[in-house]
A protein has these predicted regions:
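Acidic, Ser/Thr- and proline-rich intrinsically disordered linker/docking segments
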Residues: 2-3, 56-126
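Short polybasic amphipathic segments
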Residues: 11, 36-40, 85-89
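Short, surface-exposed coil-to-beta transition loops
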Residues: 25-27, 44, 80-84
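Anionic N-terminal interaction surfaces
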Residues: 1-36, 46, 97
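Phosphoinositide-binding peripheral membrane targeting modules
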Residues: 22-24, 32-72, 121-125
Length: 126
């Protein structure tokens, strides 16, 4: 029917940082397959992050994100609040890195909660 969105399993997130070649504050699509998260951008192509490389997933307001990751606890939101989803992972070269996405609703949180459900983030070797 008119006005209904097609449910193709993809969510739109605003990319903030971490994906090489993806523009900051521009939308990208994210979807899950059996073993990874796939990020696509109409301009830059595709990036794939295997679940096995994910170390943690955090969800926080913009003020906390800017303070923790940029040592500058400020906000740019004009109306409402931006929420950041941060995926900490180990790169294929062994470096600790992160991806950051934002949204003004619970889209990011719901998507990354599903990622948590599919990964074994609960078992950590110290």
């Amino acid at each position: 029917m008119f006005g209904k969105k097609k449910n193709d399993g993809k969510v739109t997130l605003m990319h903030y940082e971490g994906l090489q070649g993806f523009r900051q504050d521009f939308p990208c699509k994210a979807e899950l397959d059996a073993s990874s998260i796939i990020f696509t951008n109409e301009v830059s192509g595709t990036a794939k992050l295997p679940f096995t490389q994910i170390q943690s997933i955090d969800y926080m307001p913009e003020l906390n994100f800017m303070g923790k990751y940029h040592n500058n606890p400020t906000t740019t939101a004009k109306a409402g609040m931006k929420w950041f989803s941060v995926v900490n992972y180990t790169s294929s070269s062994g470096e600790a890195k992160y991806l950051a996405f934002w949204s003004v609703d619970s889209t990011g949180r719901k998507f990354f909660d599903e990622v948590r459900n599919r990964t074994a983030l609960g078992s950590v070797t110290l």
